[in-house]
């Protein structure tokens, strides 16, 4: 798969919020290049729910589902490396949590410092 780097850079320079749906290995690559990027780990509500979702997709052979469940342990063990965790139990709740994280990230000092630098100087009587 892969993400088009040029398209990503264009979106970032336009000030857009960019959300990448990638695995933990892809997240590690992104964070290596952009250490200030936010990382969000989406957790299933339970192992049973994860298994039921894989079966419910009706796309994979039972052997593939079994392999995916085995891979889930390694994937889930990477969660502590992420900035935020969202439990995807109720979709709308998970979506609201994602929106809240994105909204809060827009106010990080690193993101708004240049935008508000003049205002801060004026408030401090320096400009």
Give residue ranges: language-model regions.
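ATP-dependent NMP and nucleoside kinases share a basic, alpha-helical "lid"
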Residues: 2-59, 76
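Alpha-helical elements of Rossmann-like donor-binding domains used by nucleotide-donor carbohydrate transfer enzymes
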Residues: 7, 71, 97-101
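Residue-level signature of catalytic and energy-coupling elements of molecular machines
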Residues: 19, 72, 86
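NTP-dependent small-molecule kinase module
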Residues: 59-60, 77-127
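Glycine-rich S-adenosyl-L-methionine
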Residues: 62-71
